[in-house]
Amino acid sequence: MSYTITQAQIRKFDPEVKGVYQANSRLGGVFHENNALGASTYQVTRLGYGIGSISVPGADIPNMNSATLPTTISLENWNHAEYVDYFQASEVNWDAIGKSATEVCAPAAGRRKDQIIINALDQVPATYDIAWNYAGNAAGISERMVQHANALLSHHAVPFEDRYFIAPYSVLEIMLSTQEFVTRQWVGELRPALEGKLVNFGGFKWIFMANNPEGGMPFIDNNDGTVTYNCFACHKRALEVAVGEGNVGGSGVPMLRIDRVPEKGSWLVNAPLSCGAAVVENKGIIRVKAKVPAMA
């Protein structure tokens, strides 16, 4: 009887859990995602550049010998679980279980996926970092910094399509109050980002991140009332994501788990996530430093 009810609960709440999970993952649809269901590691392969050769009549056609560059992604296993006491949710009243699943567990899983991606982005070497004071900048991210990030990606033949700029909301606040953006009327293009919408600006699709409890965007406290964030100007295929448990991309596997735990007198509501990410092309990611006032 209890097993049947548990399965009914999963069928009832799983679609909503998946929707909330995706809605709370700002970066979930940005980078290429691989189905690694049942695996602890996942290998992705990138092909290097090849240079053609001039045609010589009667001669053999030489091979370009483009390199094969494998990268192994290690998946991290996370539980996002809450116990719901029997007295809070009887087998007939599922409201407490539903609230735990959709308001606590699923959002936490979505934020964790973002954090795994952010942590992987921050592993890129400092070769192409843009300093917070580039070209005389005083705070936030300037027009020149955006242009320079775009130029660096273009210099390395990174495709123009699917370029993203990932930054915290505190950077957006400064951009919207900076004279150079306002006078060029770019403020009109940026303002929808205040509502969490994806905006196109300066050759990038901009995504602004909240200060999530999982860690959020990497930063350094300058101990002077300011912090310096690591932001990222990057291409969609510069980083690969692998998702096992919690894969909602057509695997048919429920994301929600509801288990009865008699010794605790509770239901265990869980949105497990097995996920990993790795940089596959260093030249496709530019770390941009942004100095902003610290927020409580």
Where are these regions (language model features)?
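Sequence/fold signature of self-assembling virion shell proteins
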Residues: 2-29, 33-49, 69-78, 92, ...
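Extended, solvent-exposed, turn-rich assembly/linker loops in the middle of proteins
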Residues: 126-197
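Short, mixed-charge, low-aromatic patches
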Residues: 1, 56-65, 101-108
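Structured, hydrophobic secondary-structure cores that serve as assembly/anchoring elements
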Residues: 41, 61-62, 69-97, 147-178
